Amino acid sequence: MNQAALESNSITSGVNESRFLEHLKTLFSTSTTVLAESLQNGRRAGASSVVFDYDVSESSLTITDNGCGIADFRALITVAESGWSQETMDSERPFGIGFFSVSFAAESVRVESKDKQIAFSSEDLIAKRQIAVEPSSFIGGTRITLQHCKLDAVKVGQALASYAKGFAIPVFWQGEELPRPHAHANLVGKQTSVGFVHVPGIHNDSQVGFESHGYVYCQGLPVNVSGFTSHYGGEIRPIVHVDHLQYTPRMPDRDSLIDPQQAAKDFDVALKGIWREHLVAKKAEMSPADFVETCWSNAKRAGCLDLMVDVPVLPTKVLTYVGETPMQRRDGDSFLYHSREQVTEAKVVSGAVMLFRDFDEEDRGDDFTRLMWAEKAQVLFVSHELPSQHWAVQHLRDLAEEEVKVSGRVVAKDEFSGGWTDGDVKLMENLAVTIAGVTHLLTEAVAVGSGDWGSSRTFLVPKGITRAGYVLRQASTYTDSNDTYCETDYEIDADRFDDLVAILSGEPAVETLEKCLYNAGVRHKTNLRNNSFRVQFDADGTMTITAE
């Protein structure tokens, strides 16, 4: 096929320049990208600062830097072309469309540099009109004036405050320098595979622990990295100044990274690596007791609990004990308290302390028997977070799997029927529970058995106690379908239960009658005053009252 035939049967790519330029307008017309690009241009030009001034009366924004200036205005307004040196091109990778954000941010734009200037509108660029290069009295680096700027002063000020936080050179707004707390030069940190990383609590004196979310900057400007960037909380979070040759911002606004999910994973690895180095150093310099107590939480969150496996001390934060009479839990309730003392491996090995895995009540029927024994035995529960190789794991017992033996002599029994629960009540002499070969006498009532359909529940009450109504909370939460605690119902049931226990304990009949009459409010019945009655109960409890 000859060349002419080939050309007639082939196509090449092309660009509709005017349409392309017109569509760029939709990307930049209301964006604060103009501010970010102006900052970057000033920094690349070697400026020592970038100054922004806004004339509210004229809606005019002036941007001035003292950098090297513009050698060729043509490159400034040519898409995908840059006037930067080859060295800057290689190190900065400018894309070549940033200045168009300036062009579309105002009705007209004036650019002055090295005693020359150009003035144009976005329509001039779209129509590819001739733009004259004229003399200017401005000799410094670069001054850009946006007449009738489409951004108001408030929006400009807010955006600059955000952009300046991590920027490399000073930024001035309306004559005042903006704070740059996250600037690389103002931070202590570590150079990592992802770039420069500052970790509060390690690289400064702030009392904070491991944080998995933080702030990310690319070439000094903030970028959003889904899965890592923090959108809440204060300033005290990790700060990452990414290696911009490795992580490319997404065009045209450069406010996020390409492949943010991978970037977030990389940042997580870098953060955890810094924490591991820090914790290894702390382990070497601190006592075992201080190390586990101070560093356990951070080690857990940073995935470094393997550093704890050979430390012969368990911290208080992983240890709990039954600190009060166990009951069915409602929201916020807990009968488990954190231990006030650490536990050493030596105490566990010697048998002075018994360790159990975390215990979850599952209405097995004897859960509260086990927990009441645990309260008496002062055993400690260890949270599930122990790594599998930790020395304590081999010493952990499972309270749910231990054989339970309940002993004692029944001295009296009856049935209780309340508004929320019912069951047999047994008054016990020498009520004892044996688990793991250790026996303890119980001095409080305990509910055993299940309230499920077809099952029975029994309340075991040690002889000698006078109030045991609280045991009903082991059988029911007394919470209705609206999650409301029915306290009055509980108190009524508890009083009735205590009355039954008193009778089983041998309360004289006259005292029982006196309580019944008192609770019925008979003292307020004026027609009963100065009268005597004979009260009789038959074998079925039927009452007969005769006036005397």
Enumerate the language-model features and the residues they cover.
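Short beta-strand-loop-beta element adjacent to the nucleotide/active-site pocket used for signaling
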Residues: 55-61
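Conserved active-site aspartate in kinases
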Residues: 65
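Bergerat-fold GHKL ATPase/HATPase_c domain
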Residues: 1-40, 44-47, 73-77, 251-262, ...
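Flexible, glycine-/charge-rich segments associated with ATP-binding catalytic modules
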Residues: 1-11, 109-111, 127-173, 179-180
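GHKL/Histidine-kinase-like ATPase module
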Residues: 154-161, 166-275, 304-349, 358, ...
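A conserved short beta-strand within the histidine kinase catalytic ATPase domain
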Residues: 48-55
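Charge-rich (often acidic), low-complexity intrinsically disordered regions concentrated
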Residues: 1-11, 58, 68, 72, ...
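Flexible ATP-lid and adjacent glycine-rich G1/G2 motifs of the Bergerat
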Residues: 68-129
